[in-house]
């Protein structure tokens, strides 16, 4: 019996390493169906009727041509990852969207997670991945910089099409999360002046002010070249500057996905500047990915750890996703005596640091 179990374990191990070695097929197949706009083609205004690859193809390529068999191969593989439902009848395979697949459907605002997928798989980012090991050998330069000659954010500014895609990607991810945050977190009660650090075009600040009309003034604070393109929003003032030098004063400061791309010392510096800008009792409200303590095999843990490696590879080799305890220590180091975490989403957590 022991020998049989050992043989089966070896078979399972070989199967597992084969899956890991071929796993690049998953994001590349996902990228392909996004580029082809498969989700919108199936969704068709909410119909989501099961369709064969041969039926989907003309919706993707109205002028004709294409290969339905190769499209089916992509759909079938992604069905095994829960992106599509596969309906098998009389030897014919048809596909509809799962809840995961529906996140790729363009909504009435032109948003979806599709841009997030595309942003992650641009050529400049893909060039960095074969160099991930260099982050272990020498963390002073990110794999992205090694592959492209300069850090990611500087590279984006020189390539407007990449920067525009990143902004659309962040909007597609931000809007559903902010909705969840506004439903599950009430920490904006009593705030009259709110500063959004790294607020980009001000979308999140606009949503917060619409939900909490008692906030009389919003400050959208970002780099000068970013806020220069920001649209006018009622009760919002766009302010350009550098968060490492100063942060505008407010009753509360909001930031999302800022701390994860900076080192511990840099985070401490940013948070100390927030501390200076807040009155006694004021709050820094940060939305960040928070790692679990245990490295289990759940979807949540894997998604968070994968995001951590993405940060290490593309943005900062020593920037990182952190555990709740690591954020608690940052709070102490930056002078915030009170810290609370609110789990309103499976990926992002609302962190409240009170002065």
From Swiss-Prot:
It holds the Pfam family Methyltransf_2. It is an enzyme of class 2 (transferase). InterPro entries: COMT-like, O_MeTrfase_dom, Plant_O-MeTrfase_dimerisation, SAM-dependent_MTases_sf, WH-like_DNA-bd_sf, WH_DNA-bd_sf. It comes from the Eukaryota. Keywords: Methyltransferase, S-adenosyl-L-methionine, Transferase. The keyword Methyltransferase applies. It catalyses: nicotinate + S-adenosyl-L-methionine = N-methylnicotinate + S-adenosyl-L-homocysteine. Its EC number is 2.1.1.7. GO terms for molecular function: nicotinate N-methyltransferase activity; O-methyltransferase activity; protein dimerization activity; S-adenosylmethionine-dependent methyltransferase activity. S-adenosyl-L-methionine binds at residue 222. One of its GO terms (biological process) is methylation. The keyword S-adenosyl-L-methionine applies. Belongs to the class I-like SAM-binding methyltransferase superfamily. Cation-independent O-methyltransferase family. PANTHER family: O-METHYLTRANSFERASE. Involved in nicotinate detoxification in planta. Catalyzes the conversion of nicotinate to N-methylnicotinate, which is a detoxified form of endogenous nicotinate in planta. This is Nicotinate N-methyltransferase 1. It comes from Glycine max. The gene is NANMT1.
């Amino acid at each position: 019996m022991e020998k049989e179990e050992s043989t089966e374990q070896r078979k399972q191990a070989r199967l597992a390493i084969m899956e890991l070695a071929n796993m690049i097929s998953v994001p590349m197949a996902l990228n392909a169906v996004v580029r082809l706009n498969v989700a919108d083609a199936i969704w068709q205004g909410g119909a989501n009727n099961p369709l064969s690859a041969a039926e989907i193809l003309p919706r993707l390529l109205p002028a004709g041509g294409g290969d339905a068999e190769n499209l089916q191969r992509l759909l079938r593989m992604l069905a095994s990852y829960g992106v599509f439902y596969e309906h098998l009848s009389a030897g014919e395979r048809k596909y509809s969207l799962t809840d995961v697949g529906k996140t790729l459907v363009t909504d009435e605002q032109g948003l979806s997670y599709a841009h997030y997928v595309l942003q992650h798989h641009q050529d400049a980012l893909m060039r960095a991945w074969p160099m991930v090991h260099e982050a272990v050998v020498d963390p002073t330069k990110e794999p992205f910089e090694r592959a492209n000659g300069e850090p990611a954010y500087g590279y984006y500014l020189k390539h407007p099409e990449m920067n525009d895609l990143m902004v659309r990607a962040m909007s597609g991810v931000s809007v559903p999360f902010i909705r969840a945050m506004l439903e599950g977190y009430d920490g904006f009660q009593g705030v009259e002046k709110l500063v959004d650090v790294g607020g980009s075009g001000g979308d999140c600040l606009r949503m917060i002010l619409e939900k909490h009309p008692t906030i009389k003034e919003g400050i959208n604070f970002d780099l000068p070249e970013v806020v220069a393109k920001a649209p006018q929003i009622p009760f919002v003032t766009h302010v350009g500057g550098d968060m490492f030098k100063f942060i505008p004063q407010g009753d509360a400061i909001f930031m999302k996905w800022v701390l994860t791309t900076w080192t511990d010392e840099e985070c401490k510096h940013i948070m100390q500047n927030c501390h200076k800008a807040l009155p006694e009792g004021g709050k820094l409200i940060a939305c960040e990915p928070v790692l679990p303590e245990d490295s289990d095999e759940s979807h949540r843990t894997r998604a968070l750890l994968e995001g951590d490696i993405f940060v290490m590879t593309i943005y900062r080799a020593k920037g990182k996703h952190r555990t709740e305890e690591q954020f608690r220590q940052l709070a102490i180091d930056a002078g915030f005596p009170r810290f609370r975490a609110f789990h309103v989403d499976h990926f992002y957590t609302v962190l409240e640091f009170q002065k």
